UniProtKB/Swiss-Prot annotation:
Source organism of the structure: Shewanella frigidimarina (strain NCIMB 400)
Source taxonomy: Bacteria, Pseudomonadati, Pseudomonadota, Gammaproteobacteria, Alteromonadales
Domain of life per record: Bacteria
InterPro entries: UPF0114, UPF0114_bac
Keywords: Cell membrane, Membrane, Transmembrane, Transmembrane helix
Membrane topology according to the record: Multi-pass membrane protein
Name by which UniProt lists this protein: UPF0114 protein Sfri_3655
């Protein structure tokens, strides 16, 4: 009975596989939004204000960072919790595949969230005249919370690895 239970529990990790695959659909949606922004800029490129262009650029960087975060979570999560990725000897293989454990993935995700939050905060600051001061304060507090959380997770990871 114990063996059956353990095999069943071990096999249940495959439930995560379609979830990781589903994240690729979100990645596809981000790609659509990215190019939608590009196509909105092109007709107005000569009339758009520099500040607006910078804000749009920051939005595109934000989308790119979220996409990178998704790829990292999809591949590392799949490799850590479901099965090893077999991409073949002759094909390109990302150098970090198979080398990122759950702890380092957590730190990379935290660093990515801080980077995404930084871009978002920069967008808020660039548009500060249109945003209430109390809202800016909340954006700043949330960002500081992300930074402190990432630092704490990194520090805890460092002391537990010793």
């Amino acid at each position: 009975m114990e063996k059956v239970f353990e095999r069943l529990m071990y096999a249940s990790r495959w439930i995560m596989a379609p979830i990781y695959l589903g994240l690729s659909l979100i990645l596809f949606a981000l790609g659509i939004k990215f190019f939608q922004e590009i196509f909105h800029i092109i007709p107005n490129i000569f009339s758009i204000k520099e500040v607006d262009l910078v804000l749009i650029t920051l939005s595109l960087i934000d989308i790119t960072l979220v996409g990178g975060l998704l790829i990292m979570v999809m591949f590392s999560g799949y490799e850590n919790f479901v099965s090893q990725l077999d991409v073949g000897e002759n094909s390109e293989k990302l150098n970090w595949l198979g080398k990122m454990d759950a702890g380092s993935l957590k730190n990379k995700v935290a660093a990515s969230i801080v980077a995404i939050s930084s871009i978002h905060l920069l967008k808020v600051f660039m548009n500060a005249e249109n945003i209430a001061n109390d809202k800016i304060m909340w954006y700043l507090l949330i960002h500081i919370t992300f930074v402190l959380s990432a630092f704490a997770m990194g520090y805890l990871d460092k002391i537990t690895r010793k």
